[in-house]
Structure formats: structure tokens, C-alpha cells
């Protein structure tokens, strides 16, 4: 017979597992796992599917913008996805790369970051002339 401590631990793990599974769709969970494994091809396949299943989740277009399009320097698509996330809910707090931040603040931070990165690369190229 199981001890009370083991039953308590098992019950907590079961509740935690149910909570985690109810938070995200299977598609989004698959995409996040692919990102964690640096399988960006698989992530780019699953993130659009996740957006179809969870059209009201601004975190998904944010993640796709940052992890797929920004990495590929596809700035137009990155901005389009940022705009989509802002239209869904600019005030919602989402998890981006382990940080919890509002969509509006994340968009501002990442646009500024990538703009500065491109600007600095341009300056470096200019100095080589």
C-alpha cells in the first residue's frame, strides 16, 4: 500500500499535468518543444497550425516572429506578426524566451533590439569602405 506522502506527490503531479495540458494546444506545445530542441523547421511548420487552433493567443505570433522570422531576418513578416499579436491583445502578458512581459512591451523591445542590431551592422559595413 502506498504511503500518504506518495499519494500526495502523485496527486500533485496529476493536477500539475492536467493544468499544463490545458494551457496550450497540442500544436503550440509541439512548436515550443521544437524550439527548445532548436528544430526551427519543425517549429515553423507547427506555429501556423497553432495560430489556427488558438487564434486569440497573441503569444503564438510573437514567438513565430522572434524565433522564426527574426532569425531569418525576414523583417516584413516579423512586423506583420507583431501587428497581429498587438491586434489580438496588446496588454496580455506572455512568455517570450522565459520572460513574462506584455505583448506591447515585447514588441517595443524586440523592434528596438533588431533595429539597433541592423543599424550597427550597417555602420560596421560603412566603416570597412
Name the predicted role of every residue range:
Residues 38, 72-73, 129:
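Residue-level detector of the short coil/turn that links helix A to helix B
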Residues 24-32, 58-66, 95-129:
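Amphipathic alpha-helical repeat scaffolds of TPR domains
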Residues 42, 76-77, 121:
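Alpha-helical positions within canonical tetratricopeptide repeat
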Residues 55-56, 90:
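Short coil turns that delineate tetratricopeptide repeat
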Residues 69-94:
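TPR/TPR-like (Sel1-like) alpha-helical repeat modules
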Residues 48-53, 84-87:
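Conserved structural position within tetratricopeptide repeats
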Amino acid at each position: 500500500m502506498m504511503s500518504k506522502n506518495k499519494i500526495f506527490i502523485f496527486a500533485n503531479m496529476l493536477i500539475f499535468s492536467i493544468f499544463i495540458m490545458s494551457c496550450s494546444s497540442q500544436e503550440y506545445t509541439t512548436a515550443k518543444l521544437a524550439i527548445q530542441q532548436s528544430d526551427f523547421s519543425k517549429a515553423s511548420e507547427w506555429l501556423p497550425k497553432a495560430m489556427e487552433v488558438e487564434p486569440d493567443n497573441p503569444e503564438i505570433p510573437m514567438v513565430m516572429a522572434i524565433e522564426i522570422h527574426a532569425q531569418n531576418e525576414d523583417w516584413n513578416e516579423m512586423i506583420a506578426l507583431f501587428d497581429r499579436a498587438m491586434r489580438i491583445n496588446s496588454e496580455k502578458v506572455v512568455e517570450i524566451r522565459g520572460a513574462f512581459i506584455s505583448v506591447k512591451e515585447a514588441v517595443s523591445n524586440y523592434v528596438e533590439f533588431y533595429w539597433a542590431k541592423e543599424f550597427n551592422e550597417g555602420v560596421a559595413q560603412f566603416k570597412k569602405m
